[in-house]
Amino acid sequence: MKILFHENQLSYRGTSNAVYNYALFNQEYLNNESIIIHQKNNKNNFGPAIEKFKKKFEVHSYSNLNEIDKIVSDTKSDLFYAIKAGKIDGVESKNCKTAIHSVFKYYEPHGDVYAYVSEWLSKEMTNGVAPFVPHMIAIEKTDLDLRAELNIPKDAIVFGRHGGDTTFDLPFVKKLIIEISKKRKDIYFVFMGTNSFVFKSIFTPYKNIIFLPKSQDEIYKSKFINTCDAYLHARQQGESFGIAVGEFSIANKPIITWANSEEKSHIDILGDKAVLYTNEIDLNDIIQNFKVDKDKNWDAYSNEFSSERVMDKFKSVFID
């Protein structure tokens, strides 16, 4: 069976990583063939991400929606899979079965199968009537970290975050990080793929606030996670699933997250393992009094979101 996987852009972001993993394990676990299709001129295309896909899959790009069905026919695809916001946008096929995977709070059923990316989103939008296929959480394993490379002491407490460049967006969290960094030199904040919100100078070097570029290197990402003692989440929108949250969670890192976000799939999955804050006072107390507890089980994702369990669900919802 051939599945044509559509993503608007091939990027550093979570949906592209999700598509990569679905396509990879569609081949390795379900023994199907995976082909990739994306928008040629999308401004969010990321060169290293495109190259990563090309190393594993046949990759097609298009400029106009009417090219999709030609690519479906040319590749002899049996299923057209599209991950998208959830709106009717013309991204579907008339030439084969179409599976729509909705990542946001929309309910505009189209295609042959319309499913959400989390149980929380299905409940939120359809009281659980619509099916859901979650993302899988799979990262490369290494025992190495980046502390020596980044000049971070072994005994320092490190709060980390990776994700979309503009989605670390709670102003009071940014303000608090700057304030704490001035007083607590034993606390470090390390961000990967996140726009800097700190003005550094010779007078205010903020050596304990570090911004790293985004990376497609899975081992480097694993080293980054190992560098951190906890994940600091500060996204107003929240998460309809939360891949980065899951990657830290399976590495047994506590997740510190805002309780009042609009989308709460990550909070739903974390349950009592979530470390919640509602305001600056809460977060200041959490950070200032944080103690590393490696004996506690912080992992809320490994059991439900392994590649095998997710692909079994993918097959039952989208393929069968």
Map each language-model feature to its residues.
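Conserved donor-binding/catalytic core segment of Leloir-type glycosyltransferases
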Residues: L4-H6, K141-L144, I152-F168, V190
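A charged, aromatic-enriched C-terminal amphipathic alpha-helix characteristic of glycosyltransferases
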Residues: I281, Q288-D320
